[in-house]
């Protein structure tokens, strides 16, 4: 029996072998189904913010690259090899709106656990995202992972 039916694991380009080992070990023990959310950093470009945000776009220069796809595929393959149902998602988000993007995805997927395992922004960014999750969905469990870099 697993503690969590669905988990959302957030990672970014700073993930390393220790990150993958922690995710594999924790999820194989505790999760039936895992959604890996790779966060591709987005940077705001002057002059584009007003126009693009007005039409509902991100407003930055983020682009999903083959490296992003390879990274999320590596996590998905790792978890699938452990016998879990594993899925991958890539989102682009600037640091200031990362929390909203994560919470929106977690709610859309109906997860009961969100694991914050991204490194960009450090502990302060993870604390902010945790507050956003608790404020919008107090029944969702949140696991804040220690830095691996």
Model-derived regions: residue spans:
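A short acidic, amphipathic alpha-helical/loop segment
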Residues: 21-25, 101-102, 128-132
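A short acidic, glycine-rich active-site loop
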Residues: 55-70
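Residue-level detector of structured alpha->beta connecting loops
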Residues: 31, 110, 137-139
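Short, hinge-like loop/turn segments at secondary-structure boundaries
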Residues: 52-55, 105-107, 132
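Conserved beta-strand segments of the P-loop GTPase G domain that flank and frequently precede/overlap
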Residues: 9-12, 36-39, 89-91, 114-117, ...
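Glycine-rich, Arg-bearing micro-motifs that act as flexible, cationic patches
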Residues: 113-138, 149
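Structural beta-alpha unit
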Residues: 1-2, 80-114
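Small/aliphatic-rich secondary-structure junction motif
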Residues: 2-57, 84
